[in-house]
A protein has these predicted regions:
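Conserved alpha/beta core of the MobA/IspD/sugar-nucleotide pyrophosphorylase nucleotidyltransferase superfamily
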Residues: 2-12, 146-191
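Nucleotide and nucleotide-moiety/phosphate-recognizing core
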Residues: 7-124, 130, 161-166, 190
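Active-site catalytic microenvironments for nucleophilic, acid-base chemistry
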Residues: 91, 143, 185
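Glycine- and other small-residue-rich loops at beta-strand/loop junctions that grip anionic moieties
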Residues: 100, 133, 171
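Short histidine/acidic/glycine/proline-rich micro-motifs that form metal-
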Residues: 105-106, 140-142, 169
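Short aromatic/basic micro-patch
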Residues: 106, 135, 172-173
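Flexible, gly/pro- and Lys/Arg-enriched active-site loops
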Residues: 112-156
Length: 191
């Protein structure tokens, strides 16, 4: 981790390094009514004054760089999501961070607000089932850095579950029909 700028500042690590094989196109770049999914997430996170770190694969670097945020390449994205999180943690300027997978956009602004005001590693939960994004404590950031990049995050940390009302918390963009559902939801709801 880099030198801490402010104890109150929180960085958001947006994960975009996945291969998107099931969807057939890069999830970060899918069009949602004239805006890419990554643009929607950045706007939502910037609204909470979070510093953005985008972790991506080499093939998407140029597109991600156009967004004007800090971009880091995971040179081995096949190793798993934890490896991408490690890449982002190494660039932190805050002690805590919010982990935001690009394919899990169903959280509300109220959920972000709840999470960034918590000190312990926590995640939103709907009906007892945890979701994303996840806020990481300084201690858990250090645990993740010392872990194998292929170790699933759930085997490294144990987030406190915070029950939220987000109807679409568990929306996961993996297949074309998920994308159509997201497009419909964004018209009908404030995501």
């Amino acid at each position: 981790m880099k030198t801490v700028v402010s104890l109150g500042q929180i960085d958001a690590i947006v994960l975009t390094a996945g291969a998107s094989k099931r969807l057939g196109e890069p999830k970060a770049l899918v069009d949602i009514h004239g805006e890419s999914l990554i643009q929607i997430l950045i706007r939502k996170l910037k609204g909470k004054k979070l510093r953005i770190i985008i972790v991506t694969r080499v093939e998407l670097f140029n597109e991600m760089e156009k967004l004007g945020e800090k971009v880091v390449i995971n040179t081995n994205p096949e190793s798993g999501r934890t490896g991408s999180i490690q890449c982002g943690i190494k660039e932190l300027e805050s002690e805590r961070c919010l982990i935001v997978p690009v394919d899990r956009p169903g959280f509300s602004n109220a959920t972000i607000e709840k999470l960034i005001n918590l000190e312990k590693t926590s995640c939103p939960s709907k009906n007892g089932r945890g979701g994303h994004p996840v806020i990481l404590s300084k201690e858990d950031c250090e645990k993740i850095l010392s872990s194998n990049p292929s170790t699933p995050l759930r085997d490294i940390i144990n987030p406190v579950k915070i029950e939220v009302d987000d109807e679409f918390l568990h929306l996961n963009i993996d297949f074309p029909n998920d994308l159509e559902k997201l497009r419909k939801i964004t018209i009908e709801h404030d995501l």
